[in-house]
């Protein structure tokens, strides 16, 4: 990518910005960690809230995002201390140890693929552009990519991934078609994969519910990046590092992510689990978090119209006791 357009490509409208800022309740001097830095759309505003006596930590595994975000923060909030950490938020413990922070007052997780990643065809996230099948959040790592999943996993495992991670009704048919096609030639591009998906879905079903490849692309992306395992580890670490009164704000975009967030907050907010017939608690469980959002926040209609990515966004918030 041309260096001159790097920052421009990583500028996008942050989802539910007002709700995020209101939910985190940051103040001057707070330490805040944006676990999904991206183009720093949320981070710039959070940095402005914590001010020169506060501190912003930004986590991302994408070198392009880190470079663009760093330039934007230097330009728009030059007086606010900020530290950018390259890595996966599943490794939040190690990253925060390296940053030498005693605790954090606010965590933001904006899950899913950023708009700029979708817009760069060579990354292989988009079903609207023909590109190599990659889908790695950190393309610099020599790790599993989408082409390897599609060309080497057996039919049973492919069907399971498409069904569980993509909630794809026609998972078995698509998996069968993948295996049939790869016996003829390797499946190497997003264009090939889209055609295979279409062939595995009945024509009548393809006419409804958005792009027919959306669910399958989501499923393969989650498998490549181990997104659900990473989310669970990230939430566990954030809960441990959160200062009393601090908050975790999570924006999710599909039911699998939202369920993990909901269950984590529920588990961490439970107190005694002893049976009612036991008069004195013996389990020792104490609540760690207080759930702030009994029901998730959703984007207002005007934002959805302006920013379609916000359509499926849900925010859940919890506070450290």
Where are these regions (language model features)?
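S-adenosyl-L-methionine-dependent methyltransferase catalytic core, i.e., the SAM/SAH-binding region
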Residues: 1-321
């Amino acid at each position: 990518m041309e260096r001159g357009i790097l920052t421009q490509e990583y500028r996008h409208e942050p989802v539910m910005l007002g709700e995020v800022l209101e939910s985190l309740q940051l103040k001057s001097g707070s330490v805040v960690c944006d676990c999904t830095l991206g183009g720093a759309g949320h981070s710039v505003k959070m940095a402005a809230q914590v001010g020169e006596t506060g501190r912003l930590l930004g986590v991302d595994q994408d070198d392009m995002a880190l470079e663009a975000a760093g330039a934007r923060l230097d330009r728009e909030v030059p007086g606010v201390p900020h530290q950018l950490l390259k890595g996966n938020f599943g490794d939040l413990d190690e990253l925060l140890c390296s940053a030498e922070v005693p605790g954090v007052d606010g965590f933001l997780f904006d899950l899913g693929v950023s708009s700029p990643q979708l817009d760069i065809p060579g990354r292989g996230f988009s079903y609207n552009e023909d590109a190599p099948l990659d889908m790695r959040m950190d393309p610099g790592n020599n790790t599993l990519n989408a082409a390897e999943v599609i060309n080497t996993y057996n039919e049973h495992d492919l069907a399971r991934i498409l069904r569980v991670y993509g909630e794809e009704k026609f998972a078995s048919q698509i998996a069968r078609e993948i295996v049939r096609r790869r016996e003829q030639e390797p499946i190497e591009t997003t264009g090939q994969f889209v055609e295979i998906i279409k062939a595995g879905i009945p024509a009548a079903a393809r006419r409804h519910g958005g792009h027919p490849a959306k669910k399958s692309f989501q499923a393969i992306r989650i498998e490549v990046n181990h997104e659900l395992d990473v989310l669970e580890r990230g939430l566990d670490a954030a809960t441990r590092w959160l200062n009393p009164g601090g908050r975790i704000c999570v924006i999710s975009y599909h039911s699998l992510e939202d369920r993990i967030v909901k269950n984590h907050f529920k588990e961490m907010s439970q107190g005694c689990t002893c049976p009612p017939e036991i008069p004195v608690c013996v389990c020792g469980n104490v609540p760690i978090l207080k759930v702030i959002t009994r029901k998730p926040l959703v984007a207002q209609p005007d934002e959805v119209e302006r920013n379609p990515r916000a359509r499926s966004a849900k925010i859940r918030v919890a506070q450290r006791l």
